[in-house]
């Protein structure tokens, strides 16, 4: 599947491949490493069920290591949208830009809470502060961001000062985040 996708990308097609996270990251890792990481073929991988969201299908569908595996392969962008609205923005961006090979890690399940409205202004590679705070800095990625936002909003309402940043793009890393960390 990755070989065919790479060939299509080499011929100029905009290519999206979707499968469960462990199959894209582990079973196809050599092809991903060679064709996407080293040869930089512009293929977008959409990984379903990262983490334990597909646990009801058994441990063969757990995508626990996918992020570590993809981060070990040079040259691959990594996105982890927090909700469906953000996923829509990510896919729109990948359809309209040539970002190079990209791994989109989907961690949500049907019925997951939303973080963003549909008019949210997504920017690839730029971290998104979701709350204001000056004492504690929290980073979140993927569908757990909605839970973090809910908890931090409640804590801030009773006097805490917590800033939550959504890490929707895990590679490339937004260099401004280092300034955020230094300021805390």
Where in the sequence are the language-model features?
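Active-site-flanking structural segment that lines cofactor/substrate pockets
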Residues: 1-7
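Conserved thiamine diphosphate
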Residues: 7-137, 162
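Residue-level signal for short, function-critical loop segments
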Residues: 21, 49, 142-144, 168
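Conserved strand-to-helix beginnings and helix N-cap segments that scaffold or border functional pockets
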Residues: 29-30, 148-149, 175
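Short, catalytically relevant binding-site loops at active-site mouths
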Residues: 110-111, 144-146, 169-172
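Gly/Ser-rich, acidic/histidine-flanked active-site/gating loops
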Residues: 135-145
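Short helix-loop-beta junction
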Residues: 147-165
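Glycine-rich, anion-gripping cofactor-binding loops and their flanking helix/strand elements
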Residues: 168-184
């Amino acid at each position: 599947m990755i070989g065919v996708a790479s060939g299509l990308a080499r011929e100029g097609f905009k290519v999206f491949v979707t499968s469960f996270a462990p199959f894209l990251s582990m079973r196809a890792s050599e092809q991903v490493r060679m064709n996407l990481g080293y040869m930089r073929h512009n293929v977008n991988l959409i990984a379903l069920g990262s983490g334990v969201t597909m646990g009801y299908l058994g441990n063969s569908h757990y995508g626990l290591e996918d992020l570590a595996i993809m981060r070990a392969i040079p040259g691959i962008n990594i996105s982890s949208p927090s909700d469906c609205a953000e996923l829509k923005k990510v896919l729109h961006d990948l359809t309209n830009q040539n970002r190079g090979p990209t791994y989109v890690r989907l961690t949500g399940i049907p019925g997951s809470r939303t973080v963003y409205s549909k008019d949210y202004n997504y920017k690839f590679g730029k971290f998104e502060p979701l709350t204001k705070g000056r004492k504690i800095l929290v980073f979140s990625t993927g569908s757990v961001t909605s839970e973090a936002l809910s908890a931090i909003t409640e804590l801030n309402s009773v006097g805490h000062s917590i800033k939550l940043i959504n890490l929707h793009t895990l590679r490339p890393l937004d260099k401004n985040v280092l300034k955020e960390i230094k300021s805390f």
